[in-house]
Amino acid sequence: MKQKETKTSQIALVDGEKLSITDSFASLFTLDEEEENDSVDNEEIKLTKEKHEKLLLLFWLHCKFPNGLEWLHSSSDLLPEQVSEWFNFYQKYRFKRGRNFNLSARESVTPIVEEPIVPEEPDNLEGVSEETPLKETSLELSEEEIITSKSPIPSPETIHKNIDVEEKETIEPTTPVKEVETTAHAEEEKGPLTPDSEYAARQLTEELANKSSQEEGVDKQLRVVEATEKEHEEDGNEENVTVTKPVEVATDQVESKEVKKKEVSETTEPTAPPVTVAEVLEIEDKVPKVDEVEEVHSPEAKVTENDVENVQSGIDIEKTIQLLNNQEIPSEQQIISVDKATESPVQEVAVDVNEKPVDEIVEPSKLQMENKLPSEKSPTIDRTGVEAPLFELSVSMPLTLIPPSKFSEPVKPELSSEAWLLRTEMSPLHLRLKNAHKYVLSDNWSHAYREEIVRQSLHHLTVAKEKGIWSFRQPKRQNEMPRLKTHRDYVLDEMQWMSIDFSQERKWKIILAHRMANWVMDYHQASDKCTVCTPASLSKNKKPYMQENEHQKDSHEETFNEQIVSHFNLNDNNNNKVLSIPRDSLQFYNAVFSDDIFVTTNSEQIQNCVLNVPMYGPPTENNEYCEEISEKYPITPVSRFAYAKTKLKSTCAKASRKRLFNQLELSPPESFMEKKARSDENQLDGNKIKDDNQKLSSVGTFSVRPPYPPSSKDIRPEAPWLPEEDELLLLLLRRYSFNWEFVASRLTPPGLYIPLAEKRTAWDCFERWIQVDPRAANVQLTGSHARLAQQKLDESLRHSDKVSQHLSLRDEGTPNHLIKHNSYFLLPTVSRHYRPITIFEAIRKILKKREFAKKPTMTKRAIAPSAASTEKLPPVPSPLELSRLKSEREAQIQQIQAQRNFAQLQSQNRALRPQNAAVAAGAQQHNQQLAAFQAVAASQNSSNNSSAGVSPIAGRMVPRLQPYAVSSSLKLTPEQIHQLQQRKQTVPTTERTQ
């Protein structure tokens, strides 16, 4: 009970509002004290105690930090003094409750007022954004400006008393409000600073904007004061004077705070909703600038301090809100808002005197500023009483981040006929089909054909629209003239009869022919020919003159009918029926409704078709018109199945991929009792299969065209056939009329790689059919290679052990788990359970053969070591001995090689001796000849010079020819030496000729 009372009392402390605190705040002020009762088993008591601690902590936080709890998020660490203060507060007030708790707890906590940290002023302030937030001081100054418009310029002391008005402080956390500044000419900051948090950034921008606006405001105020003083001196009228004078505001913040607290305790005023940027821009447009202020002189410019207080206290907030909603801002109202500066606080007081009464001027201006400009230290509350969000920042979002609405989504325009016509003319479909790199179906060409037809029709339509001859109302299609029936139409009518029951039609034709033969015999045997003859119909060859004697013809017909009745001796009961029938339909009645050909059926479909069939009979005399069915339907209905949609058996029911579907042979699943009864019948009737085989073998002979037999190279061992494969072979042969190639492809399992043992050929199927099918005993082979196939078949059957054995549809040796109902339709891919067994058996046989082949070689190898084991093995040499033997062997090899080289060199020298002698003799002879030649030439030159009286010229020095250096190793034959000598002799002769 105590815990519940504590909970209710704490909720009452916060004015009935529901408070909640996050775990982050609770973690900052953790309690390390010990519990009084450590062994607390009740969980509800624990929960209520924790709730009480959190509420108490929240109360202390609101009292300690009245400016808001956002300071806890922005601050890095808490001071130990604050934490210890909280511990003391908790120990003191955790058991107290009631009204005394509220007063004593509030007085015990000393609040901490946050002082904004103003950054240093940059050197150059340029271009601050125009949409800067308004300060709270602008609201306060606007109120003073309105007050001073009614009173003369008061002293600084009186202004200081009424300049700062603060609203009531609340326990709830304050919210930083978006502020807007009305100054039109703002400067931007030269270098943007980067604060640590968003709140600090907002404070920084506000302070910079305030400083720039204050400097501009002071300059404007000084200009206005100077201008007004000059005009006052010139005019000299003290009655009509408007003075704007800068007023200094006291900088003592302590006194102003005390005044604010007293005023807040007395009166509380509701706050207005936040001001948006658009509303501020409208205010700026409507409020004239300072340069455009018109000076209006009032007769009385002195107001006492009591009047100012009366005006301030006489403002009704509710009335002002109504006036603000109904009344716009006056166009001639002029308000100059100047923020309070930090270093040199100077404010401007604008005195606006108008011809209107003071109350009418004061109320709208003050109402607007109070309603539009909220305070900074209190949370903004809308007119509906809803509290504004914690942070209200003016951020210009880019257009890309705004989600598009459903109306802004681009709607894909429908393709018009003109656009489609243009596209098809630029790139028609039939040209693309001609150049297609893939196969093109007939459906694609039909689509291109239809596109061309539509394109041509649209083209004609556009041409008709251009000429003005096109109307949206199309004329009705004109019916064509019906045509007369031709022989083809009569044949089609007869085909309708034949389509109903062709076999009965054939019987009826035979009977009709038999009757006609009897009529001919009756004609020849009759004594009176007139009784059996019928007059020929002359309707087609009728002439105009015969129309006059039509009554004679009618009388002749009546007499003829009477003769027929008397000739056939009809009974009285039948006379009425026969005489009532016309002569033209008499033959039809006797032929169709005879007992021999009339067929009754229970099929409703056939009975309905008979009603639509035209009456059988010869063509009438009148020309019948044929109804053209092609006008209604795309094709001429030859039969009643022309417009029926053909359905394949595969589409009627979805058969399994590995099963052959047969709609007629499929039976419903059997129950357990039916299976048991069927198995008992098979056991009792063991000779049933043999009887069936005998019935099949009793069939007469029939011809079969065998496949071409394989060559001797293509013969391979026969693959095993399973009982299911035999059943499937017989089924496919009956279904596809002994198409051996197609049946072999169906029996071969699908896949890219098919082993040779599993691949079935046409000849394999033919051989297996001869062995399995009992009807193969009466078969007669036909075709060009029938004799060759018979020879191959005899050779293959001669080697087989079971030539005369005819397997049944199910072998007795087939395992029971493979005998299933409807296994007649199983494909070979389903029943491949025997393949691994056959492969393992083949591997086992091969391994046995290898084992038998290895046994004699193993005995021989075992005998050889036994004989060698009796002999003594030589001792194993050591490494030193092996190296010595190797060096001795290498020395012997080198010695033998040197002897061979020396003998070869001697033999070469002996062969070169006569050759060297011959070469030396030839060189000596050449030198002698050269010397003789030089001597003769010198003598000739000297004789010529002496005869001409010219001094002799010294002969030229001819270089001496050196013999060829022939190595001793060169071997020259005598013929080569002779050729060399001749070449040397020819050299001087050529020089002489030159």
Curated annotation (Swiss-Prot):
A single BP term in Gene Ontology: DNA repair-dependent chromatin remodeling
Protein name per UniProt: Chromatin modification-related protein vid21
Any GO CC annotation of this UniProt entry: NuA4 histone acetyltransferase complex
Sequence positions bearing Phosphoserine: S298, S378
Superkingdom assignment: Eukaryota
InterPro entries per record: Homeodomain-like_sf, HSA_dom, SANT/Myb
GO molecular function terms attached to this record: chromatin binding; DNA binding
Disordered: annotated segments: 122-275, 288-308, 671-693, 857-880, 975-994
Domain HSA intervals: 475-548
Isomerase is among the record's keywords: no
UniProt biased composition (Basic and acidic residues): 158-171, 178-191, 204-233, 254-265, 288-305, 672-693
Coiled coil feature spans: 880-912
Subcellular location: Nucleus
Organism expressing this protein natively: Schizosaccharomyces pombe (strain 972 / ATCC 24843)
Role, per record: Component of the NuA4 histone acetyltransferase complex which is involved in transcriptional activation of selected genes principally by acetylation of nucleosomal histone H4 and H2A. The NuA4 complex is also involved in DNA repair.
Primary gene name: vid21
Main location: nucleus
Quaternary state and interactors: Component of the NuA4 histone acetyltransferase complex.
Family listed: Belongs to the EAF1 family.
Domain Myb-like, residue spans: 713-773
Keywords associated with the record: Activator, Chromatin regulator, Coiled coil, DNA damage, DNA repair, Nucleus, Phosphoprotein, Transcription, Transcription regulation
